[in-house]
């Protein structure tokens, strides 16, 4: 048996080697080591790239199995967006662009799942987030109902944080089966959008 010491894996705590860095694109690589093999028994190469095109940043992940057998893995990001100076988290409105609905679900609502105590997807439906024309304000107490809103079944194709009615940041999440939305509203001025 192998134990993962943290719910977020080991890669985030390791030093990546720069592979390519120019004006609009950077790539970094992490390869397995005896230290990683003790936690994760696979030979791998993980490359993470960031590309800037105009006002859009694209994040890319490439995982390569260096063995001949099957390699199990899970990957995800932890993007957090800081509230502009002089503003509050409560100045934001969420705008969800819908991709699909569960059976019996209204177009202006999203079903969210109850996360496990470790923060993983449980598969258990926790509730329904009501939307008005795809939007809901981030009000004080918004995260009292759910510390993390976790949407499944690729219900959301993109999510925007609106500030003064205009997109402050928009994240596409078409290719992801889950989207987590959370904040530590009382202590940290950021909002996390995690595909």
Residue ranges and their predicted role:
Residues 70-72, 80-173:
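Active-site/ligand-binding surface loops and adjacent short beta/alpha elements
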Residues 19-26, 51-56, 85, 164, ...:
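A short, structured loop/turn motif at beta-sheet edges
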Residues 25, 56-58, 70, 158, ...:
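Structural motif
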Residues 167-195:
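Active-site pocket scaffolds in enzymes
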Residues 48-50, 57-65:
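Short, well-ordered beta-strand segments enriched in hydrophobic/aromatic residues
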Residues 2-54:
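Extended, loop-rich substrate-binding clefts of extracytoplasmic carbohydrate-active enzymes
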Residues 60, 78-80, 190-195:
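Active-site scaffold segments
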Residues 6-12, 80, 172-179:
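A short, sequence-level motif marking secondary-structure junctions
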